[in-house]
Amino acid sequence: MMPAFVLDTSAVLTILNREEGLDAVLTLLERAKDDQDVLYLPYMALMELEYLLLRRVSPEETLAILALVRAWPVHVQESTEEWRHQAAMIKSQTPLSVADAWIASLALLHHAELVHKDPEYEHVPDLPMAKLPYKV
């Protein structure tokens, strides 16, 4: 079974903003392109990315960037009943935002490491994580 990873919005932004941790995320993308790893991108991370982009750039630029991200070697994961239930369980037991509960729950469902920069995920017990340098 190939190693699996879920990209949090912060991991995507690490690439787009050329932040610390860039090399680690680029390595994961390269490995996924070579079928060495499986990368998942939750629909909720795409939604977060879209609203953040819309605050900074035009709608046309936003759509272009989203198309670029969707072209990465990632599996964009849409909602399922099982995923919704897992997210609700996490949200009911932790202080995570709704979006972060969705994203964390996908990692648990796929037995994947969550690639992120968000210390809030520390509240989720047994969540496998590939932590990027936290923002200060």
Regions found by a protein language model. Name each.
Residues M1-L41, L54-A67, V136:
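Short, well-structured N-terminal submotif of metal-dependent ribonuclease cores
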Residues K33, R70, L108:
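Anion (oxyanion) recognition and catalysis
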Residues V12-L13, L46, Y121-E122:
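A generic structural signal for short hydrophobic patches within well-formed alpha-helices
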Residues M2-A4, A104-V136:
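Acidic, PIN/NYN-like endoribonuclease modules and their adjacent C-terminal/linker elements
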Residues H75-V115:
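Active-site neighborhoods of divalent-metal-dependent phosphate/nucleic-acid chemistry enzymes
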Residues L7-D8, L41-P42, P95-S97, D118, ...:
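Histidine- and aromatic-rich ligand-binding microenvironments
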Residues L52-R55, P73:
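Helix-loop "lid/cap" segments that line or gate small-molecule binding pockets
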